[in-house]
Amino acid sequence: MSTVRESWLKPKKNIQTNLGDYEDMDKISRLPDDLLVKVLLFLPTKIAVSTSILSKRWEFLWMWLPKLEYHNTNYSASEEQRLRSFINLNLQLHRAPIIESLRLKFSLGRSIKPQNIKQWIIIAVFRCVRELSINLFPLYCIENPAKLPSSLYISKSLVILKLKDQILVDVPRMAYLPSLKYLLLKRVTYKDSNSLHQLLSSCPVLKNLVVERDEYNHDETLSITVSSLQRLTLKISRGGSFDELVINTPSLKYFKLTDYLGECETELDDDSYSYVFKDMPKLEEAHIDSTYPDIGKFVRSITSVKRLSLCVKVNAEEALYREGICFKQLEHLKLCPCDSNWSKLLARLLKDSPNLRELEIKLNKDHKASFDDPACLENQLNYVVQSSIPSLERFTWTWIYGSQNEIDYLEKLKKRLLLTNWQNLV
């Protein structure tokens, strides 16, 4: 084992000699093993392994580490081969009774193959891994996504699972993850349209879900149905065949939705998709960044929020949402002014938020400010200046630039609403 370790690390002789000379005066080495292992936890795995050359006292301490991380970033072909041999030999001999965390980040196709990843995951699951993070990307575009072992989907110990990029999600029928609370799926490939549903159905205590759907996913519907879920973050490529977003999460407290156009997509008139949102009575915070114009379809599900951030497309000719909807608990509102009719949305939200305390107008990252139609802006202003929100304490305007009409608009709002805290950043 020592030969494999040294061939991976390749320590320089003069460094090894200096460290050996320093051994007699090394006070840290006198600490108990469990304390030294805690010290090693602050180091990257490769550096922690390199401490084995310090002395016999340190030779196998790293093998008690409960957290391991391996990657082949900027590795040559020969270095990859040594790393693969090192993991093959040492992971199965690792001395920690439980592997709390295993993180693997590899490019596939040269020395590291899908079967290597599969074998390492099998070992980790057998050792009761609690956190597993797999990030795979192809060295060559022709590489197929890696299929993970079936044992992963029946792990009783797994609490956190993160899967990214070149991974095939193929969920067996007996899948059951009784301890999984955090699940991240970014740009993965699903075996079929039912794979995500099968995976979510196997997680009875799931609390936090992050899903990113890229333009290469051709499923028409993204459906999230998890009764226990409390936090949901979605990033969706809205082009291609994507047609519908369905969310049924009655315990949800935090919701973030972002849609975008992928690199291979262009802006089209029919690139919108439909929302089917079930009631979310416990929702406290929502961030919506979407170009889909039918605001009314999701507003009914977010009326319980205390914090709301919106960047949505507003149709100047249609009503925003039905009368009678009220955001009674809303205290903090953030609005992105990149749509040409943003002032219409602001006017309506001010009317329907009687307990609003903080109002923030801020351009989202990578968004471009729009210039409202002067007539539309004036109409909205005439309505808003008649409003009174005594609860409002702070109005923040963070913007790159704005038209004179928009600046005047916000100045009048400030004066009318008698704000006690005003910040105007141009």
Curated annotation (Swiss-Prot):
Gene3D superfamilies: Ribonuclease Inhibitor. Keywords: Leucine-rich repeat, Repeat. Residues 25-71 form the F-box domain. CDD domains: F-box_AtFBL13-like. The keyword Repeat applies. LRR repeats lie at residues 50-75, 80-106, 160-187, 188-213, 221-259, 265-290, 311-337, 338-363, 373-399. Pfam families: F-box, LRR_At5g56370. It comes from the Eukaryota. This is Putative F-box/LRR-repeat protein At4g15060.
